[in-house]
Amino acid sequence: MPKYPFVEEEFETVRTIIRERASISRYGDGELRCAIDGSCSSQKGDPKLAEKLRRILKNDIKGLLVGIPRSVERYDWAMYNSKKAGSWVKYRTHRFGSLLDPSKKYYSSFITRSDNAFHINCKQYWDLCKVMWDKRNVVFIQGEEKPIAKTKDLFGNISSSKIIIGPSHHAFDEYEKIKNEAKKHYEKNVLFILALGAAATVLACDIHLDGYQALDLGHMGAFYGNIFKEKPGLEKIEKEAISNDQIYNKELYK
């Protein structure tokens, strides 16, 4: 079995993003399946997507963190969801291990998943997360069905926000449209927060290469809302899917 590389823990992953104003591309089980020419529930297989995902896993791009699952052998799984341990072991086999650079330092993809990392289920952790976007002009790029931006308390400390709505399923099919829409918002102090499945993993890298910070934070809003029982705090939004060649941009908070 290939040697599993070092993966930084969740608190330190967030601290690194804050300290270095780094971007992050994250891999969960769906992205890993897509990287080996497979598919997942939200994204059908695509050779171009698979190639991009594989390349990012071994990249040496300054300021871009790559998040992967933590090893079930290297770390104390009392802090994690042991029910999923078998799943990560499967991806450590020849199907997945060969995609990684054993000498590269990786970061945790569990930073948004308190169902995987039980110890981040605390106010201290979520307060730390809020520092990542404190007083920033945020552009959310998200799917229509599970909008990360709906958790108003989580993002209540940002300066301004706009939203780009993409497809909740098979978003990579509309990748160029989504990326071109993101480029319209390139400006000083902008931060992109992405929740768009496997498409977000590669989009975070592309936005970073253009010189802007991008955080792939899918599932974060849902788990924060579950923990703090937050109800959606936004007014009703009329959304148009990007697949219909219409993008919806709106100030969410003032």
Region annotations inferred by a language model:
Residues 199-254:
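C-terminal functional extensions of proteins
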Residues 2-7, 16, 47, 62-64, ...:
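Catalytic phosphate/metal-binding cores of nucleic-acid and nucleotide-processing enzymes, i.e., regions
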